Amino acid sequence: MDRREFLNRTTTASFALGFSSELSANPLSDGGGQGHVGDSSPKPTLSGTAPLTVQGDMAEQMVDGIHHLLLRRTKEAAGERPLLWNRNYGSVELYSLSVSPNRERFRQIVGAVDPRLPASSPELVGSVATPPLVSTGDGYKVFTVRWSVLGAVIADFGGLDAEGLLLQPDTTPVARVVAVPDADWTPEMLVGLAPGVPTVSQFARRYAENGCQVLVPLIVNRDDTFSGIPGIGFTNEPHREWLYRMSFEVGRHVIGYEIQKILAAVDWFTAENAKARVPIGVVGYGEGGLLALYCAALDARIDATVVSGHFQEREAVWKEPIYRDVWGLAREFGDAELASLILPRALVVEASRGPEVNGPPHAREEHRGGACPNGKLATPPLDSVRREVERARPFFAGLKLEHKLRLVESDAGEGPCGSEGALREHFGLLGLNAPLRPAGIPPVDARQYFDPNSRLQRQFSQMVGFTQALIRKSPQRRKEFWAKANSARPVASEFTEPPWQSCSSQWSTSPENWRQATKSHRDYIWEEVFGRLPSPSLPANPRTRLIYDQPKYHGYEVMLDVWPDVFAYGILLVPKNIKEGERRPAVVCQHGLEGRPQDVADASVDSHFYHRFAVRLAEEGFVTYAPQNPYIGDEYFRIIQRMAHPLKLSLFSFILGQHEQTLKWLGKQPFVDASRIGLYGLSYGGVTAVRVPPLLDGYALSICSANYNEWVWKTTSVESPRSYLLGSEYEMCDFDFANTVNYAELSNLIAPRPFMVERGIYDGVESDEWVNYEYGKVRWFYSYMGIPDRTEIEFFDGEHEIHGVKTFEFLRRHLNWGKPDKS
């Protein structure tokens, strides 16, 4: 059984959440009513807590609150960016040096980090049927070309090339320009060789007609033709989203790959300039405008840039298509800040009618649904363009280079790109003062059998292959990341007795060796991979309400404040036979996707997946707590990831804070032993069990059920039918996760605390082979540390469910609790 079937069958998956279409929600209602109470004798609230009077859907209100916090932080982002910059306007050199750290951070988050191949002249591409000379225009010739970009990562995968058109002037070039089309325009459209772009917007040939050497790269489009796994299935994810999902996991991006292609063209231009120096420019529209802006921000060799149909306020980037999702972008970089990285060079912003994208391609029989459904593109509002340009002006004024920033409005921001005004400004800033020649007649394509889809497929497949090579290489990158921590281990030459005995002496008697050696790694993972919010800023202010009175335990709803608008909520089951002064072990029982605390802690709910495991543990004498995690509401909760990523946050930024506050409060209860609190989660709760305890020391052990697997493979595979690439769970992507951690590395961070995996052999989450492959590294590590008895895996004859046999024994043993309570 896979996750999708789990959702279809779970008792809570089909309930109507009734979430408002607005992102804003009403404050928590204070109804003053009481939950169901078995009899009048139990206390209506826990000692030391206020009455919980909030009514309504707690999960809905939790997700609403996170939305509120993210909207507020998004609104505040632009005002807080100066804290991340240290501009020095003393001179051009000092300024460039002062913004260099920001430029390098930007290079990292767009994934333009691989060293490019040495500059080489583009090669002509053709055959007997399709010769490389495509056409002859007014003063220039058009060739099909390919140029090298990135070398192979590993031996059995190729590198990355760019393909497109070269417009070579008949005379010595007066400038060299990369003309970047929108994603849905082919190079031929931008030159006028194919229909689809108005004559006035065929700006690539306008540069060639005026004596420029022009390269026009292919940009991957927004169709979904190749988005899938042949023989398994195809999705409606745009090509750009398909590439985004897998590349994000290895710290790369479809944007970064295309930046590299453009900058490889600039490499060649620069080499050509060794013969005779002429200015270098980049001009782009729509997606090409984004790429032009990003390239100019990264490369000082570009003298002047035109950005058309893109430049505007960028705080709402989460509303744009997901393939524009860049980790931490809005936190540090609006379009104005990127313009400041172009200084002291020149920028022309053309306010023009932008590409209109209303969502991904429609799902259909041969391309099933799975694409991120939110994300649209529309013409940048003129007032937004103007405001962002005005935000950028002080940066240029700081170096007394106000004239290097120009705004051109094409028909009040609604006109076509490539206007005469924009071209004149660009030519002037490139130092070309001759009058613009009138537009010539579009050239005619001499190729009779040219298929642009074959070229697109080649380029798309190359990007997929290059990314898969990076994924194959990621274990080595993780090894490099962990090298310092691993150096704390004893090596063979230090052994004076068998390894497990030596390691036992070093590790189990001094666990701080490992904790201290990995502190910087844990901080890095929290801050750079999951995104770190400050520790809870509000007092817990606990409110409780009795809801269950069962023969062996009482049940209370619990609400705790975490941050403004964000709270933690769950159900606490307290055994009745706890003696005064006794402190019991506690188990935090975490539900899965679309779940609720009631699924695990309500004796009347008979779930095929959870089997009342919080109830059963409470009946054994454990204190149990079932928290609500915010992965509920389908698309409404997934938007949290869209909103959070530009702020360098994620869904788990909030889950970690909620668990941190919960552990702090739970450990203070007079009937709980704070040193004996375990976490046991199913499915998405298993994700929690792998991600949270490595970073929160308050958990004494962790059990991952119905989730453990080789996570990098799971999220990026183009071979497996279980790949997340084929599904709608786009929120599973974490930036550069694969080069930093996998499940084994996260599990090892739990050590020396106990860790266990529970695995049903018919669980469709992953195959036993892959589960064993990843868990085997954990078993080896615990053995190497001399504590092999603190980890285990149980395979049972079942599906995506809590088994509760070996795991219950594991809890009893490692939380120091006796046999099941028979009272």
PLM features per residue range, with description:
Residues T130-L190, I547-A601:
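Glycine-rich active-site/cofactor-binding loop and its immediate structural neighborhood
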Residues D184-E188, R222-F226, G288-A292, Q312-V317, ...:
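Flexible loop/turn segments at secondary-structure boundaries
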Residues V174-A264, F311-Y323, K579-K668, K714-S717:
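Cap/lid segment of the alpha/beta-hydrolase catalytic domain
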Residues D30-I154, G251-V254, A300, R314-R324, ...:
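Alpha/beta-hydrolase-fold serine-hydrolase catalytic core, especially in secreted/extracellular enzymes
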Residues R87, W185, P217-Q260, V283-L290, ...:
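Aromatic-lined carbohydrate-binding surfaces of glycoside hydrolases
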Residues D267-L338, K664-S720, L725-S728, F735:
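Primarily recognizes the serine-hydrolase "nucleophile elbow" in alpha/beta-hydrolase
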Residues D138-W147, F157-G158, P169, F203-E209, ...:
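Catalytic cores of nucleotide-enabled group-transfer and carboxylate-activating enzymes in metabolic
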Residues E5-P27:
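N-terminal export signals
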